[in-house]
Regions:
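Phosphate- and other anionic-substrate recognition elements at nucleic-acid/protein interfaces
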Residues: 1-165
Length: 165
């Protein structure tokens, strides 16, 4: 018997880290939970990384995802930003690995193509389509929408269910 695939998408950031949990079954995705962690940039980086790790641990324990999905880094404003973002991504990837959760990564172009149908779509178009695809009535923060978008992208890239065994 088929059961839904539960996907946890993460949009890593040094100021805000977005997350989105969806279930995908028989070609349809359903919103389970989403939000973002707003980090105080005045706090030392190790403290912010710990907060991301603890939040992700709690999300994994609560939602029991079958896989984790993260957007690949493609641009940084400065070398320092790239290094900090690399640390954040490392924490996210490590938490998935600690829990034995398979990790998948997609480029921004792949995500925009999967969600909007155009690889150079605007952020507002992605946000709009995420709300439509998930039949989500409320507003979504940008980081939250990005995390849901990467989760939906993965749902479109893999078989939509797993066999219970």
């Amino acid at each position: 018997m088929a059961e839904p695939l539960r996907i946890l998408g993460v949009d890593p950031g040094s100021g805000k880290t977005g997350f989105g949990v969806i279930e995908h079954d028989q070609g349809r995705s359903r919103h389970i939970a989403s939000g973002h962690l707003k980090l105080d940039r005045k706090r030392p980086l190790p403290e912010r990384l710990l907060e991301i790790a603890e939040t992700l641990q709690a999300l994994i324990k609560e939602h029991q995802p079958d896989c984790g999905v993260v957007e690949e880094v493609f641009f940084a404003h400065s070398p320092r930003t790239a290094i900090v973002l690399g640390h954040v991504r490392g924490v996210v990837l490590l938490q998935f690995a600690v829990f034995g959760i398979p990790i998948h990564e997609y480029s921004p172009t792949q995500i925009k193509q999967a969600i909007v149908g155009v690889g150079r779509a605007e952020k507002s178009q992605v946000q709009h389509m995420v709300r439509i695809l998930l039949n989500h009535q409320g507003a979504l923060q940008e980081d939250e929408a990005d995390a849901l978008a990467v989760a939906i992208t993965h749902a479109h890239m893999v078989p939509n269910y797993r066999i219970r065994g």
